[in-house]
């Protein structure tokens, strides 16, 4: 389905092919969806992940692009602000700082990619992307957005907008709880909101590729 700012809504993604996985838990769902999205990348360009954490999905991406440099962006200090998932809770499901790595854990992440063509870029996205853009010309062919928050997602899409071109494949990790395998009442205030604002502000068009039975979905940019 072709999506633009006029017809954007969560119903648009219901037409995407569902990637079924016998194991209904989150991690196998994510990996299966990610592998299918990676198979759709035909464009030559930068391969980027935002939200590395322990490096598990970055490893999947670098396995696929074994002869290509892969960029992994993360503050490694955890969420910059609380991530509220449920409207009925007294506090955030994930407070600011959640997903931070201790020094030993960060060393493990660095070491696991030491012999791979992976460049880790530490820092908050609104700063690290600006610095990265100055030194790295060229378009983005694949983008994995796994940063949970509206604020982080809109920073990524806005700052990389000129590098996101027809053929760019983008995977979103927390778009919508399709089968309610994990409660996410406030999905409209997360990645979904950022994508809607991005396509309307910059007059972008995309087609849906896949969605998982969890929260993931993928798109290919047309305009």
Describe the residue ranges of each PLM region.
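S-adenosylmethionine/decaboxylated-SAM
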Residues: 4-22, 40-223
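Conserved alpha-helix/loop element of class I SAM-dependent methyltransferases that forms part
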Residues: 29-45
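Conserved SAM-binding loop and adjacent beta-strand
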Residues: 19-32
């Amino acid at each position: 389905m072709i999506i633009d700012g006029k017809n954007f809504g969560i119903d648009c993604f219901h037409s995407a092919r569902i990637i079924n996985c016998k194991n209904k838990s989150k991690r196998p769902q994510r990996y299966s969806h990610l592998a299918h999205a990676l198979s759709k990348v035909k464009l030559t360009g930068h391969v980027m992940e935002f939200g590395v954490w322990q490096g598990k999905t970055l490893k999947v991406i670098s396995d696929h692009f074994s002869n290509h440099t892969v960029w992994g962006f993360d503050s490694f200090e955890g969420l910059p602000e609380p991530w509220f998932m449920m409207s009925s809770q007294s506090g955030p499901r994930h407070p600011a700082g959640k997903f931070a790595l201790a020094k030993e854990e960060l060393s493990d992440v660095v070491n696991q990619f030491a012999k791979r063509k992976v460049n880790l870029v530490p820092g908050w996205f609104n700063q690290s992307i600006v610095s990265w853009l100055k030194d790295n010309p060229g378009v983005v062919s694949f983008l994995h957005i796994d940063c949970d928050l509206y604020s982080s997602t809109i920073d990524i899409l806005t700052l990389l907008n000129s590098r996101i071109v027809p053929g760019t494949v983008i995977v979103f990790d927390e778009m919508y709880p399709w089968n309610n395998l994990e409660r996410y009442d406030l999905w409209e205030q997360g990645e979904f909101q950022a994508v809607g604002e991005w396509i309307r502000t910059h007059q972008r068009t995309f087609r849906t590729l896949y969605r998982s039975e969890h929260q993931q979905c993928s798109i290919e940019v047309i305009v």
